[in-house]
From Swiss-Prot:
PROSITE patterns: SH2 (PS50001)
SUPFAM superfamilies in the record: SH2 domain
Gene Ontology CC terms: cytoplasm
Alphabetized Pfam families for the sequence: SH2
Biological processes annotated in GO: cell surface receptor protein tyrosine kinase signaling pathway; intracellular signal transduction
PANTHER family in alphabetical order: SH2 DOMAIN CONTAINING PROTEIN, SH2 DOMAIN-CONTAINING PROTEIN 6
Biased composition regions of type Low complexity, renumbered to the chain: 1-10, 63-74
Native source species: Homo sapiens
Biased composition (Pro residues): 91-100
SMART domains: SH2
Gene3D superfamilies recorded: SH2 domain (3.30.505.10)
Biased segments, Polar residues type: 202-212
Protein name as catalogued: SH2 domain-containing protein 6
C-alpha cells in the first residue's frame, strides 16, 4: 500500500482518521470542526425566523377578523357577489372542512389576504361606479311629465300666452267663467245700430254728390262743346274733319268714371290732344291734367274751366317730340 501510495499522487484532501467511539473528539456533544451546522442548529434558526415573521405580521392579524376574514368565508353574500364579478356562476360544491391553521400558515396567508383585500375593494368601487351613473334621471323626467300642472298657473298661461299654447282641452276649464250670450247680443245690437247710423249719415253726403253730378250732366248737355254720347274715335274724327287749330270738345272718359269722369280734346297742328279732367272733393272742384303737377288750377265746374281757357292760353306738350305749344279754346265742336 505504501508503495502504491508513494508511486501515485494523492487526489483530493487527506482522509480523516478513523473514528473511534472512545475518542473524545468524536462525541456528539463535543463541538465539531465541520463547516456544516448540526441538524439542531437548523431547527433553531428556523424557529427564530418563524418567531420573527410572526412578530412582524402580528398587527395585520388583529385587523383580519374585522374586514378581511368574511371575504374568504364560503357561502356568504359577499362571497357570492365577488364570484359574480370574477367568473361565471355554477353549482357550488361543498367545501371540505378547513384544518386548523398553524402559526406558519397563518403568517404565510396573511400577505395573500392583504393583497386580495384591495382587489376586492377595487372591484366593489368598480361595481359602484358602474351602478351610480346608470340611466340619466329618466324616472324624474317621466314623473315631471306625468305631474299635473297647478290650476292657477295653467289658467294664467292659457290667458296670457294663447298664441304660443297649442289648441287642446285645458285642465279644469270649469274654473274659467264662460261669457253669456246676452253681452254678445247687446254688442251685436250696438254694432248694428252703429252701422245703420253710419249708413244714414253717409247717405246725405252721397246724395249731394249724385245730385251735383246729375246737375253737372244736365248743364253739360246744354253746352255746344259737350259730346255726351260719343267715344274717343268719333270725337277725334270730328276734330280732324274740321281742320281748325283750337277746335275743342268735352267727352266722357273711356275708362271707369272715377276721379276722371271727363276728357278735353283739343286740335292743334293736325294732332288731337286728349287731356283728362279730374274731379276733386266729391265734385266740388275740378282740375285739368294728370296728378303730380306742381301748380294746378282748381275750378268749380267744367263750364268754368272751359270759359277760363277760352281767354287764357292752354299749354300743350307733345309726348313724342317734347315740344310745347300754347293755344286757346276757340272753336267748340260737337259730332
Amino acid at each position: 500500500m505504501d508503495k502504491l501510495s508513494g508511486s501515485r499522487p494523492r487526489l483530493g484532501p487527506p482522509l480523516p482518521p478513523p473514528r473511534c467511539v472512545d475518542s473524545p473528539g468524536w462525541r456528539e456533544d463535543a463541538p465539531s470542526p465541520s463547516f456544516l451546522p448540526a441538524p439542531g442548529t437548523w431547527r433553531h434558526k428556523a424557529q427564530e425566523e418563524d418567531e420573527e415573521e410572526n412578530k412582524y405580521e402580528l398587527p395585520p392579524c388583529e385587523a383580519l377578523p374585522l374586514s378581511l376574514a368574511p371575504a374568504h368565508l364560503p357561502g356568504t353574500e359577499e362571497d357570492s357577489l365577488y364570484l359574480d364579478h370574477s367568473g361565471p356562476l355554477g353549482p357550488s360544491k361543498p367545501s371540505p372542512p378547513l384544518p386548523q391553521p398553524t402559526m406558519l400558515k397563518g403568517a404565510v396567508s396573511l400577505p395573500v389576504a392583504g393583497k386580495q383585500g384591495p382587489i376586492f375593494g377595487r372591484r366593489e368601487q368598480g361595481a359602484s361606479s358602474r351602478v351610480v351613473p346608470g340611466p340619466p334621471k329618466k324616472p324624474d323626467e317621466d314623473l315631471y311629465l306625468e305631474c299635473e300642472p297647478d290650476p292657477v298657473l295653467a289658467l294664467t298661461q292659457t290667458l296670457s300666452f294663447q298664441v304660443l299654447m297649442p289648441s287642446g282641452p285645458l285642465p279644469r276649464t270649469s274654473v274659467v267663467p264662460r261669457p253669456t250670450t246676452a253681452p254678445q247680443e247687446t254688442r251685436n245690437g250696438t254694432a248694428d245700430a252703429a252701422s245703420k247710423e253710419g249708413r244714414k249719415s253717409s247717405l246725405p253726403s252721397v246724395a249731394p254728390t249724385g245730385s251735383a253730378s246729375a246737375a253737372e250732366d244736365s248743364d253739360l248737355l246744354t253746352q255746344p262743346w259737350y259730346s255726351g254720347n260719343c267715344d274717343r274715335y268719333a270725337v277725334e274724327s270730328a276734330l280732324l274733319h274740321l281742320q281748325k287749330d283750337g277746335a275743342y270738345t268735352v267727352r266722357p272718359s273711356s275708362g271707369p268714371h272715377g276721379s276722371q269722369p271727363f276728357t278735353l280734346a283739343v286740335l292743334l297742328r293736325g294732332r288731337v290732344f286728349n287731356i283728362p279732367i279730374r274731379r276733386l272733393d266729391g265734385g266740388r272742384h275740378y282740375a285739368l291734367g294728370r296728378e303730380g303737377r306742381n301748380r294746378e288750377e282748381l275750378f268749380s265746374s267744367v263750364a268754368a274751366m272751359v270759359q277760363h281757357f277760352m281767354w287764357h292760353p292752354l299749354p300743350l306738350v307733345d309726348r313724342h317730340s317734347g315740344s310745347r305749344e300754347l293755344t286757346c279754346l276757340l272753336f267748340p265742336t260737337k259730332p
